[in-house]
């Protein structure tokens, strides 16, 4: 049986009684009129004023600009931590009330007074129930242990002096401490660089004496890495997306088999060579066939791939599915786009996943578009995707980097936050009219791996099963720790089951929709 602390069919009363703060004219007007003026189910977002923050810096910050989403004070409201590059990072504490306009205050603690930050990933590194932050830097990375009140304390960590641009973590079978990997970009110490001077990557596994490093080489300038149980056999492997701009000819995408001694999958395993200007990784079972598609952002076409068979063989399908997003869809700049962070989520709650892609020129690369709007690809009934970024109001022309689709005000709709290079951070509230039903599922475990990283959630609405893996990593230089959101169309009840990390599936249970459900492993 499930234990269900925090089972909630109604909004948290304490949250609903908090002071709302000033109601912005833009959001208030849209909230008042959206139900009358909008076409049903057409996505709509309204801009939200937030404290000023810019990701800036020279060539070492052309990449990066990650965004971490975490509840750092235990009030169930997602807070934001954005990398700053040459500026300090910022922590935006969420002060929104349920179903009301989104509000944030700058609550950056002294521990985030850091330089040269490229990204941030939340996870509970020390198993104390408070979310921590892995801060990636051009230089030594920093692990910050959360105190449960949005303040942090530096933790002992020495991962060397690298240009860090990607992170992922998991808990391997039989381990009480996390395994984590850090992806590195160009080796700044190589006098022959930067081209063909990609650094190696690092895998850190727990031992009785602490974490021990395994160097993963060759490195091909990783910009996104992700531990994922792609084969659904209970063992997460490590996927890496690499930037052809610097590896040029000898590199490729990589998938490491996490055996006792890690090894790269090869053609003998069914792995095919893929080369692209890899920026971000996102995975999701879009067609409900029990296998996750892999979506890779890049310069030019964004690479959606479908798994073939049970092995690590993938077929490119971006044009067949309408997900290539290879050029700007508004404006008169016809040069190729540059994609960064990809976030999946059902923004209309109609039961079909959508995809947001943060777009923007690296800096001033003349072969690529400068006027390069973000994409919001809406999932259609036939399995294809259609562009709605301009209709939805999120087609920003800034040079975007990290991003997140997450419910910021507890109303069951996924909102959007985006970090921009040399332009202010942007947040949009989802004000879509007549959305479908939804379910939010938060998993916790006692004593170790408190966020249940590696668990699978399946939700059956009677038509198809949505499957979701709890992971840390992917994206571009940032990620989300928190509940898993499911859009469910018209369903009023669904069946739910969990496969806890390294465990068996629970029995199916029927639960009502339109609620935040918290489940703790017995």
Protein language model regions, located:
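Gly/Ser/Thr/Pro-enriched helix-cap/hinge segments flanking short amphipathic alpha-helices
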Residues: 37-38, 42, 46-57, 152-154, ...
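Beta-propeller blade repeat segments, especially FG-GAP/WD-type strand-to-loop junctions
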Residues: 38-45, 88-107, 140-155, 192-212, ...
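Surface-exposed loop and turn segments in beta-propeller and other repeat-based domains
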Residues: 46-58, 109-111, 267-272, 317-333, ...
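Beta-strand-rich domains and repeat architectures in extracellular enzymes and scaffolds
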Residues: 49-87
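Beta-propeller blade termini
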Residues: 64-72, 93, 117-127, 131, ...
